Amino acid sequence: MTKSVLAKKEKTKRKNEFQGRWRIIWMAQWDQEYVDEEVEGYFKFGTGGNGDFQFGYVQGSMDHRATVREGKPAIEFSWEGGDAADGTPLTGRGWGVLEGEELTGIIHIHLGDESEFTARKE
């Protein structure tokens, strides 16, 4: 097989590791009560590079890509959405690394807060 075919197969395999719903079990910036305020906090990575998330009153739609960070499967995403509490439009970016059964990473709100997070696949 050529390098490009192998790379494509490897990339597809990494995407499948993240596809699905991940329950947010910890965030550095906010307590779990806030994370689960409206719904249990989550990230959902779908097919075709799309996805969504919610924690507290913050909701967003994501564009994600599988990658590798320090030799570990990882995912990077940009997002747009809003704060349902006051209607503020929000955008941001983030990333996560697969550490065993958990996804650990950081979500950034452009010109605002950021938080480390840990999530487990449901």
Which positions does each model-derived feature cover?
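Short structured motifs
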Residues: 61-63, 90-91
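Small side chains
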Residues: 51, 92-96, 105
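Short glycine/serine/proline-enriched coil/turn segments at secondary-structure junctions
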Residues: 32-33, 85-87, 111
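Amphipathic/hydrophobic helical signal segments and adjacent flexible N-terminal regions
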Residues: 1-50, 57-59, 65-74, 80, ...
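Short, exposed beta-strand-loop hairpins at the edges of beta-sheets
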Residues: 104-112
